[in-house]
C-alpha cells in the first residue's frame, strides 16, 4: 500500500541511530531516544496560500531531514512505522 500525503504534509521513515554510547555501552530499548532523523518517502503537492495559489515544498522524496522528537503523527503502513508531518516540522535537510 502506498500513502500519498496531502498539501504541505510529508511521509518520513525514521533512520535508526546507534544503540551504543561512545564508550561502547549498549543501550536497552527503554533508554534510547526516538530518532530525530529520517528519509522523506513522499510529499504533498504543496502549501495552499490564502490567495489560492500552491507553494511547492522545499523538501523532496529521498531527502534526509532533521525533526523534533515529538514531530508528526505515527502511522503503520504494511507493518512499517512511518511519520506524517507538516513540512514546517522539519528543522533542516542533511546534505553531503
Swiss-Prot record:
One of its GO terms (cellular component) is cytoplasm. PROSITE patterns: CHAPERONINS_CPN10. It is found in: Cytoplasm. One of its GO terms (biological process) is chaperone cofactor-dependent protein refolding. InterPro entries: Chaperonin_GroES, Chaperonin_GroES_sf, Chaprnonin_Cpn10_CS, GroES-like_sf. Keywords: Chaperone, Cytoplasm. One of its GO terms (molecular function) is protein-folding chaperone binding. The keyword Chaperone applies. Residues 26-48 are annotated as: Disordered. NCBIfam families: PRK00364.1-2 (NF001527), PRK00364.1-5 (NF001529), PRK00364.2-2 (NF001531), PRK00364.2-4 (NF001533). HAMAP family: CH10. Heptamer of 7 subunits arranged in a ring. Interacts with the chaperonin GroEL. Together with the chaperonin GroEL, plays an essential role in assisting protein folding. The GroEL-GroES system forms a nano-cage that allows encapsulation of the non-native substrate proteins and provides a physical environment optimized to promote and accelerate protein folding. GroES binds to the apical surface of the GroEL ring, thereby capping the opening of the GroEL channel. Belongs to the GroES chaperonin family. This is Co-chaperonin GroES. The lineage of its organism: Bacteria, Pseudomonadati, Pseudomonadota, Gammaproteobacteria, Moraxellales.
Amino acid at each position: 500500500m502506498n500513502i500519498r500525503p496531502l498539501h504541505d504534509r510529508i511521509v518520513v521513515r525514521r533512520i535508526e541511530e546507534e544503540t551504543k554510547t561512545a564508550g561502547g555501552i549498549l543501550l536497552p530499548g527503554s533508554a534510547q531516544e526516538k530518532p530525530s532523523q529520517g528519509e522523506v518517502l513522499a510529499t504533498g503537492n504543496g502549501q495552499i496560500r490564502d490567495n489560492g495559489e500552491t507553494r511547492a515544498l522545499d523538501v523532496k522524496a529521498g531527502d534526509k531531514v532533521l525533526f523534533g522528537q515529538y514531530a508528526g503523527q505515527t502511522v503503520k503502513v504494511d507493518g512499517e512505522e512511518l511519520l506524517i508531518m507538516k513540512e514546517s516540522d522539519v528543522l533542516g535537510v542533511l546534505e553531503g
